[in-house]
Structure formats: C-alpha cells, structure tokens
Amino acid sequence: MIITTWNIRGMNSKGKQRYLKERLRRDKPNIMIIQETKISEQKLKDIFGKFKPHYKIIAHDAIGSAGGLAILWNPEEVQFEDLVSLPRILSSKSRNIGSQEWVLLAGVYGPPIPGERKIFPDKPWIVEGDFNMITSLSEQRGGLRRTNTDMEAFGDMINEQRLVDIPTINGTHTWNNRRGGTHQIASRLDRFLISEQVINRDIFIEAMILPGMVSDHWPIKLEIDLKASPKMRPFRFEAFWLRDQKFMTKVKGWWRQSQ
C-alpha cells in the first residue's frame, strides 16, 4: 500500500491542480491525504472528475478560503468503510482489495486535541498529516523556539496511543518558509505515526519526502506491505529502534551509502 500526505496550501490555482495530478500519476498512491485544500468537497470532485484512475473523495469543506481536509483513494485497489469525521480528522477502516486485513487510517490537520485522541484506540492505526507540531528542537531550524510544554504534550500523545513516529529516509524537514540565509525556518511538521502492533511484524515500511514545488510543505510518501514475507525483508523492523536518538543519523548514513 502506498499512502501520501501533503499540505498543498490551496487548490484554486490551475497550476497546483496540474501539479497534484502529475504527482498522482508519478507516485501512484492507493490513498492520498490533502490538507488545506481551501475549496469545497464538490469542487475537489469536479477537479478530479475526468482524472484516471478515478479516485473517490471524502473531504471537509474549507471555511471561507481557509482549511479543508480530504482523502482520495483508488477504489480499484483500496476499500474504505466506517468513515469518522471530526473537525480536524478524517478516518476510516481501509484494506487492499482482496486482503482480509483492515487497518484504521486517519488523515490529520493540526495537533489532535484531547477529545479527538479518543478515536485512536488500541487498534492498528496509520495516522498521517500536517500536525503543525514538532516533538523536539532537533526537528526545527531557525525561527522562534517552541515551548517545551507543547512538544512534550505532542510526544505524550504519541506515546500514550502507542504510536511510532516513522522517520523519512531522505531528510527531516517537511516545511520551509522559502526564505534564505538567516531568515530561513524549516520544521518537521508532517509525519506518519503507526501503531506499534503494526510495526512489530515482519513488514516492509519506508517513508520518503517527495518534491512539492507549489507549496511550502513537501509531500511525504509511505510505502507499507503488511504481508511481506521474511524473504522480502532482510531484517525485522522493531519499534524500539525509533526511540534511539542515534537512529535518524544511522538511517541517513544507510541512505547515502545506497546511492
């Protein structure tokens, strides 16, 4: 299964619409989550009305010219059931066509508030989106220092829900203010969080930052195979590796060596 998430910062521009369609053709995601569409669900459906493959769409309408959250999925490859809609979260059960294994999927825009966290029970979850929050100062370069209280609250939510923060193999920052020199600010605002019970299997999993020239956020792609056999995996992915502070450095080193 391939899932991408992207804060596109508005889809009224024809140029952004063309670029998004090109990304869909290139990346071929089964599921795509889009934040800040800044348009209505109906307009989003009109934009993709003649696009092939024909993606199904569920969305929160933008409020005026702000906000908007959408999930697109290819019904020939993925089945969705039991939609839950909250102000900043869209979630559903999903599975690959032909598979008997359901995974709960949630697209997020902004850090979940305490009441919204109740949708993350002790079940297999893949949570993705623009959380607009970092877990530590190492995830930000430049700009005003985030408060420890906010970062700790976000980290506590991840730990309490037994989610694992998946690192991207080709970089850290997913947002940049597009300014140079000492005025540049970059942060890791977008991410995939996956339940430990999903991670602690013999699976293939990889997250990567993609090009995204029409927004100040970059798209992120997650590739996950819940049924990968031992022959397909040279080792078992363990959740506790991601709690090692040196893990990100190791991953970046492996990535460079593979080039």
PLM region descriptions:
Residues 1-259:
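A shared catalytic/ligand-binding motif for oxyanion handling
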